[in-house]
Amino acid sequence: SMVCIYTVAESWLNDRSSNKNRGSVLSVYMVILYGAMGVGMFLLNFSSPQNFQPFILVSVITSAALIPILLTKKKPPTFKRIKAMTLKDLYEASPFGMVSSFFYGTIQAALFTLLAVYATSMNFTIFEISVVTFLLAVSGAVSQFPVGKISDMYDRRLVIVISTFGAAIFALIAILVSRQMYLPEGLATSKTWFYIFLILFSFCSLPMFSLILAHTNDYIPKEKFVAAGAGLQFVFGLGAMSGPFLCSIFMDMVGSNGFFLFLFFFHTIIGVFGIYRMKVRQTVDNPDSQFVAMPQTITPAGIELNPQTEPIQEPVSISEPIESVAEPDNENKN
């Protein structure tokens, strides 16, 4: 159901956007999405998560979000069929893009699903859990732009490798900081340090899907950008299905800190595979491919907001054909 909501919302945005403002619309959409994701966690403080009221509140807010679309008198957007790329074609175009998208889906699903579980096991209060999730989302939104700018200047694979190893290092540091939380109150390390390293981790990790998408676009023609994005989203979803399950195994084997150990392990896999791909394949300079910040929940309809994709066929005003017809008549009269 959430996928349907994303698809409808992004199709409306795409239909109402022009070739001049698609990038701006996508940026605003991404900031709102991450911001709402972070702010939404504070709703847990209004009622105990063990009660049914939070679920009712989420249902009401979700329904209210659709009211502007339901009340509009404008014609709904039409869906056009996208010529999909097979997974084989996608892998041949960008092995690193496809493989890293799968593992990053595993990371993201575990991160947003089990972060609250980890924080609860570390004796965080509900308000502190809200702060943790808020910092994670906001830091991820802010990091998109500087990281994306750097990726347009250098080999994107190098930027991805540095980002993944950076996230892995900060995940390990978060383990060392969190272990101090079990000490008596007088000796306990302030949770502020945990917040700081979580922000740094998010800064390195959350721009990853946009980087992967931009890297894949470097190796394909412009007319296949949307199809490739849809394929990467599918592979991302396959990885996401296994993320929470695998992470829970790590946490069951080594305790709560298995959460960050899991994040360290899978970020390292992406980084190592990126180094391998840099040795076997040279980078290319595709002028049609540039970094555009995108959330990992983006749908094919939303990918069309990417200003690097094919231009939107904007409607021609009715006055133009009338004028073009009237001009020959005037000439004949003269």
Language model features by range: what are they?
Residues L44-N45, S59-F79, I270-M278:
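C-terminal membrane-cytosol helix-exit motif in multi-pass small-molecule transporters
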Residues S59, L158-I173, F264:
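Structural signature of the two symmetry-related core transmembrane helices
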Residues G166-G186:
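C-terminal ends and interior cores of transmembrane alpha-helices
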Residues S48, S143-D155, M251-D252:
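Helix-to-loop junctions at the C-terminal end of transmembrane segments
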Residues F46-I61, I249-H267:
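A membrane-interface helix-boundary motif in multi-pass transporters
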Residues N19-Y29, I126-F127, I220-L232:
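Loop-to-transmembrane helix entry/capping segments in MFS-fold secondary transporters
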Residues F79-A84, R277-N334:
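Intrinsic disorder in cytosolic terminal tails and internal cytosolic loops
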Residues C4-S17, L206-I220:
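Intracellular juxtamembrane helix-capping segments at the cytosolic ends
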